[in-house]
Amino acid sequence: MYPAHLLVLLAVCVSLLGASDIPPQPLNLVQFSSMIQCANHGRRPTSNYMDYGCYCGKGGSGTPVDELDRCCKIHDDCYGEAEKSQKCAPYWTWYTWKCGSDGPQCDDSKTGCQRFVCDCDATAAKCFAKAPYNKENYNIKTRCQ
């Protein structure tokens, strides 16, 4: 093998090692997004909830600013309980559900982590659908300290 080939091979190996440290996107968020659309019948895009209030989106702090933000805090707390009491990884837990006439419904045959996380998401999606959406509470993280 020529020295240039060895350098190329080494570069490929190093880049593959670096890529292995990049975590994949949580699968559960795809299901949660679909549940939200099921519950609100497509009236609001899921992206509207990604940076709303103090708790909708990644992390959360402060006091929820309204009913919708409280739904997000309850969902965050539910995921925390899933991690603590159920020893689940809620962002990675895949579950079975269907979209019924009254919103998302979890598969009754599932137990443990799958059912717990599904219930967290279904409850939140229904809560989102009932809560008013106030545009002035979108992208306000500076008020949530």
Swiss-Prot record:
Keywords: Calcium, Disulfide bond, Hemostasis impairing toxin, Hydrolase, Lipid degradation, Lipid metabolism, Metal-binding, Platelet aggregation inhibiting toxin, Secreted, Signal, Toxin. Residues 1-19 form the signal peptide. Snake venom phospholipase A2 (PLA2) that inhibits collagen-induced platelet aggregation. PLA2 catalyzes the calcium-dependent hydrolysis of the 2-acyl groups in 3-sn-phosphoglycerides. GO terms for molecular function: calcium ion binding; calcium-dependent phospholipase A2 activity; phospholipid binding; toxin activity. SMART domains: PA2c (SM00085). The keyword Calcium applies. PROSITE patterns: PA2_ASP, PA2_HIS. This is Basic phospholipase A2 S6-45. Residues 20-27 form a propeptide. Its EC number is 3.1.1.4. The active site is at 75, 121. Its cofactor is Ca(2+). It comes from Austrelaps superbus. Ca(2+) binds at residues 55, 57, 59, 76. CDD domains: PLA2c. Coiled coil: none annotated. Expressed by the venom gland.
